[in-house]
Amino acid sequence: MAGHLASDFAFSPPPGGGGDGPGGPEPGWVDPRTWLSFQGPPGGPGIGPGVGPGSEVWGIPPCPPPYEFCGGMAYCGPQVGVGLVPQGGLETSQPEGEAGVGVESNSDGASPEPCTVTPGAVKLEKEKLEQNPEESQDIKALQKELEQFAKLLKQKRITLGYTQADVGLTLGVLFGKVFSQTTICRFEALQLSFKNMCKLRPLLQKWVEEADNNENLQEICKAETLVQARKRKRTSIENRVRGNLENLFLQCPKPTLQQISHIAQQLGLEKDVVRVWFCNRRQKGKRSSSDYAQREDFEAAGSPFSGGPVSFPLAPGPHFGTPGYGSPHFTALYSSVPFPEGEAFPPVSVTTLGSPMHSN
């Protein structure tokens, strides 16, 4: 305690004025100027922002001088992040090439040298700029060929009556990989990357050859379109038809094949649609019945706490009840362990205040 009191007293102004007052410096008061210039023991930390050779290294101005107030002196306390700083840390300087523009170095006021590019990076840039002229000519020739082929593909497709989606489906039939309509559209518009255009071109060339030679390609395309439409189609049942199916399910949850066909004819649905609906409805009923059985078992088990309800009185003092209702202020809780006889809580008188509107 004595050490703490001494340290606090050393850094607080005296009650009778500053060190320059008529009373002179007192033994418990340390002048801020002396505190700011304290160097500390050799090899130990210095105190204050003005310690060491130049505070410009940290990019902050030195601490302002003390300000005069009425009857005393205020000092500049230690700032955030500038507390006890080792002397060795003040002597560290930034390495060359890392100092930013406009930051002066500490050695003779010389400005840092600008960052130089490594020779490896320059070499790579030169290699990129100095491309082989023969390769560039080949790439340009390939681009022209791709443009001409894209125009030919579009003309052939429109002439034969194929859509872009049909071209993608027939590519799947012929080569086992279906392409989307967006891909064919982007190929014709030359919006794909150069690599993807080169990969897709041989497949489309084979499609053009098949379209010219194979007369059944249109029929194959239509059949594949129907198959894809069946895969993508999602069954939607009207509310009226769904209500009729619910009534039939209540009468017969598991109909036979003949009954399913009869129901499909009456409601205008496919047999598979009716069969799948009844299967899904039975599964839904099983899930709901299992949930109901679990709920009944939980309710039959009762409360997880042993013992009956115990009433605990509230803390003594006035309690405001709901206006118009004179109910006792007790909270019903369940105790995990029943209280033995003779250890019940003593009765506490509770004053219940009525509603302010009906009070006399």
Swiss-Prot record:
Induction: Transcriptional activity is positively regulated by PKM. Upon cell differentiation, expression is repressed by NR6A1. SMART domains: HOX, POU. A motif (9aaTAD) lies at residues 4-12. There is a cross-link at K123 (Glycyl lysine isopeptide (Lys-Gly) (interchain with G-Cter in SUMO)). The modification Phosphoserine is found at S111, S236, S289, S290, S355. InterPro entries: HD (IPR001356), Homeobox_CS (IPR017970), Homeodomain-like_sf (IPR009057), Lambda_DNA-bd_dom_sf (IPR010982), POU (IPR013847), POU_dom (IPR000327), POU_domain_TF (IPR050255). One of its GO terms (biological process) is negative regulation of miRNA transcription. Belongs to the POU transcription factor family. Class-5 subfamily. CDD domains: homeodomain (cd00086). DNA binds at R157, Q164. Residues 230-289 bind DNA. Sumoylation enhances the protein stability, DNA binding and transactivation activity. Sumoylation is required for enhanced YES1 expression. The POU-specific domain mediates interaction with PKM. Several pseudogenes of POU5F1 have been described on chromosomes 1, 3, 8, 10 and 12. 2 of them, localized in chromosomes 8 and 10, are transcribed in cancer tissues but not in normal ones and may be involved in the regulation of POU5F1 gene activity in carcinogenesis. This is POU domain, class 5, transcription factor 1. The lineage of its organism: Eukaryota, Metazoa, Chordata, Craniata, Vertebrata. Its main location: cytoplasm. GO terms for molecular function: DNA binding; DNA-binding transcription factor activity; DNA-binding transcription factor activity, RNA polymerase II-specific; DNA-binding transcription repressor activity, RNA polymerase II-specific; miRNA binding; RNA binding; RNA polymerase II cis-regulatory region sequence-specific DNA binding; RNA polymerase II-specific DNA-binding transcription factor binding. The gene is POU5F1. Interacts with PKM. Interacts with WWP2. Interacts with UBE2I and ZSCAN10. Interacts with PCGF1. Interacts with ESRRB; recruits ESRRB near the POU5F1-SOX2 element in the NANOG proximal promoter; the interaction is DNA independent. Interacts with ZNF322. Interacts with MAPK8 and MAPK9; the interaction allows MAPK8 and MAPK9 to phosphorylate POU5F1 on Ser-355. Interacts (when phosphorylated on Ser-355) with FBXW8. Interacts with FBXW4. Interacts with SOX2 and SOX15; binds synergistically with either SOX2 or SOX15 to DNA. Interacts with DDX56. GO terms for cellular component: cytoplasm; cytosol; mitochondrion; nucleoplasm; nucleus; transcription regulator complex. Transmembrane segments: none annotated.
